[in-house]
Amino acid sequence: MNSRDYWKAREETQRQKNIAQEAEYSRRIQDIYTKMYQNIQDDINSFYVKYADAEGITLAEAKKRISKLDIDEYAAKAKRYVEQAAKDRAANHGKTDRTAAYFSDQANAEMRLYNATMKINRLELLKAHLGLEMIEGHDELEKLFGDALTQRTLDEFKRQAGILGNTILNNEKLADSIVNASFHNAEFSDRVWMAQDLMKYRLHEILTQALIKGLNPRTLASEVMPFIKKEILENKRAAAERLLRTELCRVQTDAQMQSYQKNGYDQYIFLAEPTACKHCKALDNK
């Protein structure tokens, strides 16, 4: 085996390892979105059971003022989220650790926004409940992304040290700067929360349209939940997986370049993977 074939084989081994790792990340993303969907489904079903009569519930009915009991129920739910977050933060001695379950600063900001802007009617209360579920889910996503990107960066530093025969760049601060770097004017965490905003808008749109028609058992079962299920478990989940793959590729490439630069290398041969696009394939062996 000549030198070029050796390096191709070595890179292919790493590619297969990455594929297996990303399959596990995809499974965890699926779990997060499944939990989010189930909680949202429960909230919508609870809303229907609480307010609908024999004919269902109309938009006018949904916009009636809510009772103090309804407000207390929402407040208790929000309090549970915050208390659990505080407990997790205390258990971690207040340190920032993406493996912990406490809310990120972004998640806390989103929750404050929901609390501040909630109108006192049934529909807005439902939206607030759904908002809590989306905040919790996207907070989990942000932590998963952070862990995955940091691990990929550190692994690549270690791998490049083995290839280049030099000291491992095991610098957590350097890894953090790569993971949280702006890419096309946004950090990975910004993109996670932008996805939450898009989901929120889409769910509110679906619910409002259903209430205009009259939210009844048939509408709920045949129109509302299938749309929401597709939006969450297919569209948004797939988008999250694509985003993570893109970000993993970005941090791995940046870690490679940092390793080359730190060790004085300014030339390299580009090896395109089998599934590369036509533009990247044109650079193979260049």
State what each model feature region is:
Residues 231-286:
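Acidic, glycine-rich two-metal-ion catalytic cores of nucleic acid-processing enzymes
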Residues 1-230:
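N-terminal leader/targeting and assembly helices and adjacent pre-domain segments
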